[in-house]
Amino acid sequence: LDMTKNQITKELNRQAVLFEQKCKQGQCVDENIRFTDLSEMWFTDYAENNLKKTTLVSYKKMLKVVLPAIGHISIGKLQPHNLNTFYNMLLEQKIGCNVTCHSDEDFKNYINVHNGKKYDKPRMSQNELAEKSSVSIATINKLLKGNVISVECAKKICETLGLEYKKVFKETDRSTISPSTVKRYHALISSICSFAVLQNIIPINPCTRVKPPKVNKHEADYLDEEETTKLLNTLQTEPQPFRTAIQLLLFTGIRRGEMCGLSWEDIDFDHNVIRIKRNVLYTQETGVYEDTPKTATSVRAIKISSHVIGLINDYREWQEEQQNKCSNQWRESKRVFTNALGVPLHPSSVSKWFARFNQKNGLRHIPLHSLRHTSASILVMNGVPLNAVSKRLGHACAATTSNIYSHVFRMADEMAAEALDDVIFKKTSENHSA
């Protein structure tokens, strides 16, 4: 059949739409599938069933940056230079990644805050706004305090409140993208391409021919002996439950989420053992949720001293007193760490309390996770074998522990060399003197 130029163009467009629909339905998948469509397949068929929720949330955000850059490219034509160009654009801040915004508008005019003031207009409650906009309460609180929030959240809030985004918000400068962040983008793209290889869509993962930027290794930050002693002494006058929570993190090296996930049944008072079975995490998208520990080896039993058991017993007495005081208001959760009403501790509240505690007492500011590093460094410096330290921390392998604390192991090795010198030369000099 002879077709006019317009008819040919129309038919080609129709076939393209049909092909795209088949690709999305999994009926026709080959190397011509666009990276965008492949990423949707990967997310549904692999990611949702195999990745942790925190990783999924992070990857969703990252895909919003990846897809505008390379989503239009068919997977069979995705070349190393496409990826290198994308990574360089990230490093040079030429891509809208990590863009935030702030507003000089007083959002208390639109959001209900119990501050005693009267307002002319009816206002929406924070919970209602969070539900309608799909923005977390934490983000709304940041907005009310005048802090920056993501552009995406700001636009959702404006749409819900009937405000014009460009009139209310001003975008801030894009924050710098570090090489380690670029490496995470590389890992995401590589995972999608590996999925394509496994599905026989392409023969080779193009990411294997690309070297992401070199990441400078940062030493784990931890407290020295003097700082640790000062921290413990200062904690003694602090209130429960934080006093015991901080000490437990230091003495066991467990992660924040593992501590928040502890139930009373996880503590064996007869054998001085804590069993790590779950992890409590928080994301803005999902709120607080319970998950399995980080890795399979993170499910573990940790031996603790009689001193630590004593701390936990004292804390349990405090919790029982609070339960008796609150009576019907007490919220039974069976969790170890709760507030005075029995509500399980929010992971972020522990970190925020620790930051305020350090500032109030003139202690060096360190993130809460550094207590884990401090615990590990104390073990290493006191000659505890690498495998024992690794098992206690719940690392997947001893090499992970060795890499994270390589500088601590070097220091311990130097101390061992000096100790050896002291013993040998002392005996040698004594023999010569004799």
Model-predicted regions and their roles:
Residues G146-V148, K214, H218, V280-Y282, ...:
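Catalytic-site neighborhood detector that most strongly recognizes the C-terminal catalytic loop/helix
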Residues E131-V135, K145-G146, G162-L163, G261-I267, ...:
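A short, basic/aromatic helix-end/turn motif that makes direct DNA contacts
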Residues K121-Q126, E131-V135, S175, N233-F242, ...:
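Short, basic (Lys/Arg/His-rich) helix/loop patches that form interaction surfaces
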Residues G96, H271, Q284, V288-V299, ...:
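C-terminal secondary-structure termini that scaffold catalytic or DNA-interacting sites
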Residues T100-S103, A154-G162, K166-V168, K230-T234, ...:
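DNA/chromatin major-groove-contacting recognition/catalytic segments
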Residues L1-T85, M89, I95-N109, V113, ...:
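N-terminal DNA-binding module of tyrosine recombinases/phage integrases
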Residues M62-V65, I73-G76, T100-H114, K118-T208, ...:
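N-terminal DNA-binding recognition helix of tyrosine site-specific recombinases/integrases
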Residues S103-K117, K121, K155, T172-P179, ...:
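Basic, Lys/Arg- and aromatic-enriched nucleic-acid-binding interface segment
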